[in-house]
């Protein structure tokens, strides 16, 4: 069973499987973003799913960031709490990534 309890282990989806078939610059953005999100705290949970990678702070608040790798960009969705609308952006360069990191950090620190 996965960390969130949605998928069985036999699905065997890994973070690395999301690196296959995307452009090098997108791969670098994704690796940079992953390192940043994991560095936010010891309680960050990474859950690779078939078409995206979900990040949660705990099992109580399911997901604060979703990253969907595309060929030439990353589609990032951020949820700051259960009542606010999901904020989605498309990132294709470092300056856009820095803006997304700011929103992700805010979401991580805002949720309890």
Which stretches of residues belong to each language-model region?
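Charge-dense, helix-prone N-terminal extensions
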Residues: 1-112
């Amino acid at each position: 069973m996965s960390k969130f309890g949605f998928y069985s282990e036999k699905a065997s989806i890994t973070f690395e499987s999301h690196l296959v078939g995307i452009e090098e610059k997108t791969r670098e953005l994704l690796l940079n973003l992953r390192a940043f999100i994991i560095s936010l705290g010891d309680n960050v949970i990474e859950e690779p799913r078939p078409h995206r990678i979900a990040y949660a702070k705990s099992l109580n608040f399911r997901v604060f960031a979703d990253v969907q790798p595309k060929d030439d960009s990353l589609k990032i969705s951020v949820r700051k709490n259960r009542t606010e609308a999901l904020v989605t952006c498309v990132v294709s360069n470092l300056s856009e990534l820095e803006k997304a990191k700011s929103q992700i950090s805010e979401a991580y620190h805002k949720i309890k």
